[in-house]
Design a protein with these regions (language model features):
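Amphipathic terminal alpha-helices
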Residues: 4, 322-323, 335-350
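A short C-terminal helix-loop "cap" of Rossmann-like NAD(P)-dependent dehydrogenase/epimerase domains
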Residues: 51-59, 153-172, 228-242, 267, ...
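Conserved C-terminal active-site "lid" loop/helix of NAD(P)H-dependent oxidoreductases
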Residues: 254, 273, 309-332
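Non-catalytic, hydrophobic alpha-helical segments
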Residues: 257, 261, 276, 286-289, ...
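Glycine/proline-rich active-site loop of Rossmann-fold NAD(P)-dependent oxidoreductases
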Residues: 186, 199-202, 212-227, 236, ...
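N-terminal Rossmann-like NAD(P)+-binding domain of SDR-like oxidoreductases, especially those catalyzing
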Residues: 1-209
């Protein structure tokens, strides 16, 4: 019998990668996406172009223009289908934007996740539920790490336990400044774990680093690499916010993250949580990214520097993915930072 997957945020970066990946594995896909990214970040961030491509390419993809906060609409979909897999990626993804409309941010990220979890529990309890969380659940605690300033990046002191592999899941999510986005995602993160641990359901929470890939509709407030490449390609001014442009992020390609989902789906666990980023394998500072993209595109970046950093922004963040690799030893990265940048620049989605 054909397997069935429900994917929220199905036209977004991780959602659309999930649609492609699982459609090509033979799943029937029910996608939920109401292009709220356009509301958050403006016309340039709309995902409608991506949704159109998916509908044209995959006959086993059915799209629903539904708001995840609307329990009646979500319940109707769950009553119509028995799902084997649920991938919940729909979100308000920017910590800057969250401060403008806290109610919208919280209802989308926390309430919307609760709507999904409760319908999963009631109607498809045998399914595997995967949630895309964020490293922002750790708040600004990573900024307390002992950092060294190098020429183009900040780096962790070599004698620190996190130096070799990055930050693991044991870092506290308490007593820190999260941003309102980090707080709403923390609520959803813990809820997803709780539905696994309390109700005994198969849930996996993936705390993403910087998620990226050629399908990213980059905007100033979200999608750092895609937006930076876009600015350099079209000659638009890019703004660096604080830390001298030396802040470091680990970047994971959308394919590598969705491949994590695939491995988890095949051998699911209950109430599990994983850090999911590029780790030591794939990380970069803003200054390093500018230099690399300039070389790929053969164009000089036009950028300005603002001394004030974004509230709660990480100076250095690299995810330790050792726990996932231990649980799923057959999984590994297929993309490094140079592959990611080359693909974004060659996608032409500017």
């Amino acid at each position: 019998m054909t397997k069935k997957a429900l994917i929220t945020g199905s036209a977004g970066l991780i959602g659309s990668e999930s649609v492609r990946f699982f459609a090509e594995k033979g799943f029937d896909i029910i996608g939920i996406d109401n292009d709220m990214r356009k509301y958050f970040f403006g016309k340039e961030a709309s995902t409608e172009w991506n949704n159109k491509l998916l509908k044209e390419k995959y006959k086993n993809y059915t799209h629903h223009n539904v708001d995840i906060r609307n329990n009646d609409d979500i319940e109707r979909i769950f009553k119509e289908h028995k799902f084997d897999l649920i991938i919940h990626t729909a979100a308000q993804p920017s910590h800057d934007w969250a401060a403008k409309e806290p109610f919208t941010d919280f209802t989308v990220n926390a309430n919307g996740t609760l709507v999904m979890l409760e319908n999963f529990r009631k109607y498809s309890p045998e399914a595997v539920f995967i949630f895309t969380s964020t490293n922002k659940v750790y708040g600004d605690t990573p900024n307390l790490l002992p950092l060294v300033e190098l020429k183009k990046r900040y780096e962790l002191k070599k004698n620190h336990p996190y130096y070799k592999n990055g930050i693991d899941e044991m870092m506290s999510i308490d007593n820190s400044k999260h941003s309102l986005f980090g707080a709403s995602k923390s609520a959803a993160d813990i809820l997803t774990q709780e539905y696994g641990k309390y109700f005994g359901l198969k849930t996996g929470t993936f705390r993403g680093g910087c998620l990226t890939g050629p399908q990213h509709s980059g905007a100033q407030l979200h999608g750092f690499l895609a937006y930076l490449a876009k600015c350099i390609a079209i000659g638009k001014k890019y703004t660096i916010f604080g830390y001298k442009g030396k802040q470091v992020r680990d970047n994971i390609h959308s394919y590598d993250l969705v491949n994590m989902f695939w491995h988890f789906y095949q051998k699911p666990r209950r109430g599990e949580v994983y850090n999911a980023g590029g780790s030591r394998h794939s990380n970069i500072s803003i200054l390093e990214a500018i230099e690399k993209i300039e070389n790929i595109l053969g164009k000089k970046a036009n950028y300005e520097y603002v001394d004030e950093n974004r509230i709660g922004d990480h100076i250095w963040y690299i995810s330790d993915v050792s726990k996932f690799k231990k649980h799923f030893p057959k999984w590994d990265f297929e993309y490094g930072i140079d592959d990611i940048l080359k693909e974004i620049c060659e996608s032409g989605h500017f």
